[in-house]
């Protein structure tokens, strides 16, 4: 399973794990992969605490940080401080959206304590809020990769990260976006197929991956969207990718912050139980279909706002997901890909890595046997 990217980053397997849980970051990197901590939702102070903890527990291994700077969002042209931008965006959020969201949660028995529900907070989603996160991440020597989940990072940010001796990655959903990343100097492009969890495009992985590989060669490409087994990693590498970027699987490990009730929801779900919805972030995001996503699709309810305004509304549901995980299942923010249909049990992180490696070997041995039988 070793690719040139493994030597580049000093890892054993080209398995990249996106997660918001620091324990999973550490467990993946210690098992030979590369853990990546999602920074959205963390204040600068909270992010510093998380990264310090990772540094203390990860040993000599390396990890990355994922930020979100969309190429289009409300207020992106405003030249102002983070505080002023937050105030401007808060004033743009209609009260009817906040009232609707709060009622939806309350109707499902989920408390929304005044001042503690995370509404109207701007915890990421803009260059102004992501820049401090990058600066904090760069203060940690074991942090060797910054990934942008939406769009091409600003040129000065790419230059700054490179000057600090770190690499830059960015997700894409089309060859056009991949070309923009490569031309800007991004080191690694992550091709996210439409079946992936979280923000994704409409093109399926098996179609997208080779298109992106061809478009930006020799820039290394990571395959994302539909990665839940070693056989799927084998398919990605066969299509020219140098590794796999995964997210959904790490919701189903023992080190995850998810409760058994939340994980049971994933086990019971099928691949057709996910939906691309704008109801949480303002951009199409694949997640489990539930009462929250259904409510925002109704013709007699408010339309989702653009990014980051919608998240300033849905933040109360995200906060409830963490504070009252078992009570909020029907209205929770559950970004997950169609690969959810493969989940059967909760495993240790190291066991997942080991299983994927063995499944990869089985898949490649199967192809070798076919070739041998054909006299190739």
Regions found by a protein language model. Give the residues of each.
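Conserved active-site-proximal phosphate/metal-binding subdomains
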Residues: 81-98, 202-222, 228-376
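Glycine-rich Rossmann-fold phosphate-binding loop(s) that bind the pyrophosphate
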Residues: 17, 224-225
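Active-site entrance/lid segments in N-terminal catalytic domains of soluble metabolic enzymes
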Residues: 1-216
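Residue-level detector of alpha-helix initiation sites
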Residues: 152, 227-228
């Amino acid at each position: 399973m070793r690719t040139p990217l493994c030597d580049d980053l000093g890892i054993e397997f080209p398995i990249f794990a996106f997660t918001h849980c620091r324990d999973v970051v550490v467990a993946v990197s210690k098992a030979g992969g590369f853990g990546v901590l999602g920074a959205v939702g963390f204040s600068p102070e909270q992010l510093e605490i998380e990264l310090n903890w990772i540094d203390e527990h990860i040993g000599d291994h390396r990890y990355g940080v994922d930020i979100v700077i969309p190429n289009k969002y409300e207020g992106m042209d405003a030249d102002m401080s983070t505080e002023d931008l937050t105030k401007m965006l808060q004033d743009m959020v209609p009260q009817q959206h906040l009232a609707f969201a709060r009622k939806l949660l309350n109707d499902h028995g989920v408390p929304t304590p005044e001042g503690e529900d995370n509404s109207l907070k701007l915890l990421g989603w803009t260059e102004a809020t992501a820049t401090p996160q990058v600066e904090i991440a760069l203060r940690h020597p074991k942090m060797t990769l910054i990934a942008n989940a939406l769009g091409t990072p600003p040129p000065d940010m790419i230059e700054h990260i490179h000057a600090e001796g770190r690499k830059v990655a960015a997700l894409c959903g089309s060859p056009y976006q991949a070309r923009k990343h490569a031309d800007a100097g991004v080191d690694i492009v992550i091709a996210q197929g439409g079946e992936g969890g979280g923000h994704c495009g409409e093109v399926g992985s098996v179609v997208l991956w080779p298109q992106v590989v061809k478009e930006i060669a020799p820039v290394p490409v990571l395959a994302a969207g539909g990665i839940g087994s070693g056989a799927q990693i084998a398919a990605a590498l066969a299509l020219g990718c140098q590794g796999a970027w995964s997210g959904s699987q790490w919701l189903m490990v023992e080190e995850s912050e998810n409760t058994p009730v939340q994980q049971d929801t994933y086990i019971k779900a099928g691949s057709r139980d996910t939906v691309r919805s704008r109801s949480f972030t303002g951009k199409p995001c694949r997640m489990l279909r539930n009462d929250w996503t259904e409510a925002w699709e109704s013709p007699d309810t408010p339309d989702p706002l653009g990014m980051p305004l919608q998240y300033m509304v849905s933040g109360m549901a995200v906060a409830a997901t963490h504070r009252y995980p078992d009570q909020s299942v029907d209205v929770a923010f559950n970004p997950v890909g169609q690969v959810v249909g493969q989940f059967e049990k909760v495993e240790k992180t190291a066991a997942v890595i080991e299983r994927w490696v063995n499944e990869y070997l089985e898949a490649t041995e199967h192809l070798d046997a076919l070739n041998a039988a054909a006299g190739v």
